[in-house]
């Protein structure tokens, strides 16, 4: 009886592990509302599903930051404002992502947008690879 229970329990654990292995772990809210809001901002800044590439995405990202009111009068990213905005969409790995923000900003209160975006984007890709896949799939639709 014990061995039957152990066998059934073991099989259930393997099934549970396999079913969770395929699930994507997202760092950011990927609700339709949030994705549509982000896509709309990028479209307002000139990036659409038809012309999206890494170069114009980075340029548009600066425009998006301006629309989100996280740039100062010198067009530098105000890190605390950026963090506040970012935290509203983070669902996992907040501590790691905020550490990435600080690292990319070199622990300064403001940062130059292009360098910061490139650094932060690379760190997000490493920390949250499934998020990039979701956003790219949504841009393609």
Curated annotation (Swiss-Prot):
Subcellular location: Secreted
Source taxon at top rank: Eukaryota
Range of residues in the leader sequence: 1-21
Gene3D superfamilies hit by this protein: Pheromone/general odorant binding protein domain (1.10.238.20)
Processing after translation: Contains 3 disulfide bonds.
GO molecular function annotations of the record: odorant binding; toxin activity
Keyword Ribonucleoprotein included in the entry's annotation: no
Tissues showing expression: Expressed by the venom gland.
Recorded GO CC terms: extracellular region
Keywords: Disulfide bond, Secreted, Signal, Toxin
SUPFAM superfamilies, sorted: Insect pheromone/odorant-binding proteins
Similarity comment: family membership: Belongs to the scoloptoxin-17 family.
Protein name per the record: U-scoloptoxin(17)-Er3a
């Amino acid at each position: 009886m014990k061995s039957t229970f152990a066998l059934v329990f073991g099989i259930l654990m393997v099934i549970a592990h396999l079913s969770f292995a395929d699930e994507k772990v997202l760092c950011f809210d990927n609700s339709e509302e949030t994705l549509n809001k982000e896509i709309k901002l990028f479209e307002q800044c000139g990036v659409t599903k038809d012309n999206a590439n890494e170069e114009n995405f980075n340029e548009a990202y600066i425009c998006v930051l301006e629309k989100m009111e996280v740039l100062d009068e010198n067009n530098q990213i105000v890190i605390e404002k950026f963090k506040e905005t970012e935290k509203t969409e983070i669902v996992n790995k907040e501590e790691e992502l905020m550490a990435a923000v600080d690292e990319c900003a070199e622990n300064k209160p403001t940062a130059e947008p292009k360098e910061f975006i490139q650094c932060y984007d690379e760190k997000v890709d490493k920390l949250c690879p499934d998020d990039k896949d979701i956003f790219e799939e949504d841009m393609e639709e």
